[in-house]
Design a protein with these regions (language model features):
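Key DNA-contacting residues within the recognition helix of helix-turn-helix
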Residues: 6, 31-32, 60
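The alpha-helix within a helix-turn-helix
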Residues: 9, 20, 49
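DNA major-groove recognition helix of helix-turn-helix/homeodomain DNA-binding modules
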Residues: 43-58
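Short alpha-helical DNA-recognition segment
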Residues: 13-32
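Short, Lys/Arg-enriched C-terminal cap helix and immediately downstream tail that follows
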Residues: 8, 42-43
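Residues within the helices of the helix-turn-helix
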Residues: 6, 17, 46
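A short, Lys/Arg-rich alpha-helix, primarily the initiator
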Residues: 1-11
Length: 61
């Protein structure tokens, strides 16, 4: 699981739906990224990182 993504999202009180809206992805895809059913592309990681003001590569830790 992408625990850092989950932690950041919850810490910032964002739902999967709201985060998805902010980066142009559906809630279903955010869920798949978090569960690692689908690999998180670097391009999407960079958009998520901008939302949370973190380095994109930290999402993979």
């Amino acid at each position: 699981m992408l625990y850092e993504l989950i932690r950041l999202r919850k810490e910032n009180k964002l739902s999967q739906l709201k985060l998805g809206e902010m980066i142009g992805k559906k809630q279903r895809m955010i869920s798949k990224y978090e569960r690692e059913d689908v690999e998180l592309p670097v391009s999407v990681a960079k958009r998520i990182a901008k939302v949370f003001d973190v380095d994109w590569w930290k999402l993979y830790e």
